[in-house]
């Protein structure tokens, strides 16, 4: 088990004042099967009332409305997470994670990787467990990509990312999800925090014996106690940390993000 202190900040600057700003945030790590979260503090500017709910995937969602003109919107989340991957609690099985979503539908490039991964899985012992199988897929995804910030967008599909052989963590995760689901593994997308990334991170969890076990295709390794979960879903769209709409004329926006995670040793 690790005691991790986390701090996540996001600042959105507008080129002109905006009004009637409605937003939805999924930025709070919550206590779950592999982590206990305490001392969470959320700050939002401009200040406004927040409504907190839990979405259908179990992620914490905050919604708010800022009617007054403003040219900056920012929030920060701080807290402490006790993460223990050695004692992950069981969760109910959800069949929807067996099927691909809009961002993970395969095309020719992903289908070719599926064929390669099927050959790798066939070479495993007959009693290979899901995590062992997923590790083979993860390795194939890792080798296929060059990590290239700015090469994709939030709308890039698994097929599009793999076609250009470059992307970021969400692209690695989307391709791995697509392949896993086609070879019979139940898998879901995770958005969270990892020390040293400077921003949010994405990885994959595979369902095994009633528990979700994490694998990080960007780094080609199993998820350990250094990872903090924020949200999970079928793909990135279910885990977007911030979504909003506002009124304004010809407004441009610039986003700044910073995330830090460090272990606190007693």
Predicted features by range, described:
Residues 25-42, 220-239, 243, 247-250, ...:
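Glycine-rich, small/acidic residue-mixed loop/short-helix segments
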Residues 46-52, 97-103, 222-229:
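Short, surface-exposed linear segments at secondary-structure transitions and domain or protein termini
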Residues 55-64, 91, 95-101:
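Short acidic (Asp/Glu) patches
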Residues 84-85, 213:
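Short, charged/polar, Gly/Pro-enriched secondary-structure boundary elements
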Residues 85, 95-167, 175, 236, ...:
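Secondary-structure boundary elements
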Residues 171-246:
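Hydrophobic/aromatic-rich core segments of domains that either
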